Amino acid sequence: LSTVQARKTTEVAVGVLLRPDGAVLLADRPEGKPYAGYWEFPGGKIEPGEDVQQALARELHEELGIEIGAALPWFVFEYDYPHAYVRLHFRRVFDWGGAPHSREGQRLAFVDPAGALPQPLLPAAIAPLRWLTLPAVCLRSAVHAYGHAAFIANLEVQLARGPALLLVDEPCLSQEEVRAVLDEALPRCRAHGAPILISSIHAALAPLVDGLLLSPADLASASARPAATWVGACIESATQFGNAARLGVDFCIAGPVLPSAEQPAASALGWHGFAALAAQAGMPVYAAGGLSAFDQQRAQHAGAHGVAVNAEYR
């Protein structure tokens, strides 16, 4: 057996408590524990007979004196610490009763994930804090279907509605045509603080934007993470998550969840199928296919980070 296989896996429930303004609660580890003084998300070990929701409710009551509502699945990943090999079940919590307060001598702070963070951070908390800055809505361009002018007009409407990430994915357009789209989309996205990514089909334009979305073929053939602030991947099956993790991809897009004009019912995962797929990701996953931004809450209950939708939705 390998060293990791030979070690006992400790199952841990992790609470990501999010206020309406996007601030997230962190706590530092008390004296006497490994990594004392390091900041982390609250939570703790899942005891025999508990599920993740039950364990998290108990831990957050014991640590913070609060009663939580539904804890929405976000992702699960494993981390190998010198003192323990842990499987971390991250759950986002938007609803709780009572004011979080220290019951175990730990310091607490609500922080902006995109701002200055307390230091030092527990290693397994670093990537999730960065992932929290990803918007819950990913707008996918469809210039090939709706035309350049209609796309830009609708993009302004969608960006005004709230935080979003724009993905320019135009396999039918030439590089020159995509560059013309970017020339108009970039200033609008910058004005709203919206990151913009481009499909790896037009990877030559990636230096102009904030990141790259790898196609399944490019994900399989890549030997290293592309040099970009954000790197995403389109996923068609659970077996591709291994390649995504190996490259250090930040998020995946998976679907189709529901039937659409482009994708028939026979290929749709359904919400249960999507939830089963997302549970294996180890990173944030956007639900795609037959969805609108109004499906965001349903998607998050199924384990999605958010939804990937056409920028032309009304």
Predicted regions mapped to residue ranges:
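Alpha-helix-loop-beta-strand connector modules within alpha/beta enzyme cores
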Residues: 179-198, 216, 223-237, 265-290
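Conserved N-terminal beta-strand and adjoining loop/helix that marks the start
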Residues: 2-25, 76
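Glycine-rich phosphate-binding active-site loops on the catalytic face of alpha/beta enzymes
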Residues: 212, 216-224, 251-265, 290-314
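Short, acidic/polar
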Residues: 144-158, 200-203, 237-243, 292-297
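Hydrophobic faces of well-ordered beta-strands that scaffold small-molecule active sites
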Residues: 135-142, 166-168, 196-198, 212-214, ...
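Conserved Nudix-box catalytic region and its N-terminal flanking loop in Nudix hydrolases
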Residues: 23-63, 75, 195-197
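Nudix hydrolase/Nudix homology domain
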Residues: 101-155, 161
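Active-site-adjacent beta-strand/loop module that shapes the phosphate/pyrophosphate-binding cleft
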Residues: 77-100
